[in-house]
Amino acid sequence: MESLTSPSSSTSPSTETFPRSSLITVPMSSERPNPRYGIYAVFSYKEHMDDDSISCVMGCYDPLINTWSHECFVPGMNDNHILKGFAMVSVGTSIYLVGGSVYRKEKVKENGARHTEVGVEVRSLVLRYDVVTKEWSTCAPLITPRHDFACSVCDNKIYVAGGQTTIDGAIGISSAEVYDVLRNEWTPLPFMSIVRYKCVGVTYQKKFHVIGGFTYSGNKMPFMDRCSAEVYDVEKGKWDHVRGMWQLDVPPNQIVVIDNKLISSGDCLNVWKGQIETYDRNLNLWFPLEGSRKENLLPIACTSDGNDRGSSEPLQRICLTMASIETYLYFLAGYRIAGDHSSCCTMSMVHRFDTSATNNQWETFEPMQVEGERELCSHCCVVQLP
């Protein structure tokens, strides 16, 4: 692997310009001091509303003290370019950014304050970030460049399947491959039975599941394919097709595993459906998790201008991702706060659901106002810290 120098490597994280959380901590006496976890996410970031400079940055949320900190800039990204449709997974204390598509932000001529995205390329690039040494390195590239694909870790190997190889056009692929982190090598896997993109990958029952997505198989009832899943048996080296595993013809937003259960909270059109759902593999159905009903992740006291005036008008959500840690589900939300052209900021809010509790499962931590506007580029990943 080739080492890289992050654009921020010469600057201490404590002095870098980045969305910085307010000095608010939340005592959590029920938490054990060890093990410690960090929830990492990649954002597009700009400091001012009319800012022409947009960066791709990675932040870390510490669930013990309810605080965001700047980790680093993502290397290899030009100014005003953002990365989307990539996978972000962890193996040990390393984070891998796999594939994705690069877009360039450009101002619209008719309205200089508004930006549009222009597709640049689909990447095969794989980056590795060590959370201990804070160093980036490049790994062996994907065999097939892809974005909007399924990805998950099983037995310390990274599995990817499906996705798209072009930025324009709704054309998916059915190829799959696996990365050995020790050998720094990608190996092709058998093709799935149908093409899929915007599908979700998750490891469940020691098998790599590729769930939902937009599909094509020539089926006269295409929604049947979009409701299905492909399951790769690592030991047998073959795919199985599971009908009706997702139930919707709209792709899922995110699926995680907690206490050996599959968990979902929304789809790509409605990322928060108002409740958490869990999968019953015996019935092949999704059911609401008891006590998880929560109509809105934004408290009613928050208004569109960031003040507490009792208005129910919601802020514009630009971030929502879910992470599982032990028996907890964390929902990390971010909302754009309107301001003048000289500044902008984001309100960060974290909710936690305790799957082991029988009542009062929800807890909402103190909101944080962070400098600049940061919009989520991909789902988060969890790292157990040494």
Residue ranges and their predicted role:
Residues 1-386:
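Kelch-like beta-propeller repeat domains
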